[in-house]
Amino acid sequence: MSSILTPGTRYNVGMDGSEQAPSEQAHSEQAHYEHPYPSPELAAAHPFVEYAVERLPESEMLERARAFRVEAERRRSVRLFSPDPVPRELLEEAVLAASSAPSGAHKQPWTFVATRDPGVKAAIRAAAEEEERVNYLENRMNAEWQEALAPLGTDHHKEFLEVAPWIVVLFEQRYEMRPDGTTRKNYYVKESTGIAAGLFITALHRMGLATLTHTPSPMAFLRTLLGRPDNERPFVMFPVGYPLDGVRVPDLVRKSLDQVFVEVDRPS
């Protein structure tokens, strides 16, 4: 059960996340907070529940972390998919996992729109290839960008959009449309949707499926093709399926830890 804190009492947070009065804190590590959360007023106005997480031995934490890191490092973007069908239930589980992502003001400003219809996939491919043809062949994509993509061997041909059993388009909701026709502002929309996209990719990888983050530019045609409302804008497109047997991917090297992680131990 969530606790209601007594005004004027200085509370600490125990190892299990529970708020404790001073007399209860002798045998736990303590963090001292001048302003407990939730405040008594907030807890009285809105529901709160206890967040209980088992604290594992550090050796087990490290073992889990390394196992997850090894599995995550095996993930690769795939451009050749098997046409074998993928049950809708697997996509639903991935979307539910993605929707556990933190979001600005808990607005969850995203919609995952999926299709396995051959006609819809063909229309998406045709429109995407037209945009990419302009990008690659008419130099809407500048030389520096094309040079960066050269090791990946990408071009305007997007056959995977028809071969993959599913196409999932993630839309960001720029604002909320309420049932009465009024609108409400959403916050940190791109940041929130990006986090959800990462969890979606990770969930697919965890269950043995492959995907590719595909962003034909511009992507406005997707809102029209998929019949989405004005408040939604396409964020990224995912072909989803099993990787084709024998598929090859670029032999790339990811950045080392010291290239992506910095610890700061004093003010600058």
Label each residue range with its predicted role.
Residues 46-54, 69-83:
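Generic N-terminal amphipathic, Lys/Arg-enriched alpha-helix
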Residues 97, 151-156, 222-224, 247:
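Glycine-rich, charged/polar anion/phosphate-binding loops
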Residues 93-98, 174-225:
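Small-aliphatic-rich amphipathic alpha-helix that forms the alpha element of a beta-alpha
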Residues 12-16, 41, 113-193:
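Glycine/small-residue-rich phosphate/adenosyl-binding loop
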Residues 5-19, 31-60, 236-268:
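C-terminal helix-cap and adjacent tail motif
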Residues 133-141, 227-250:
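A glycine-rich helix N-cap at a beta->alpha junction
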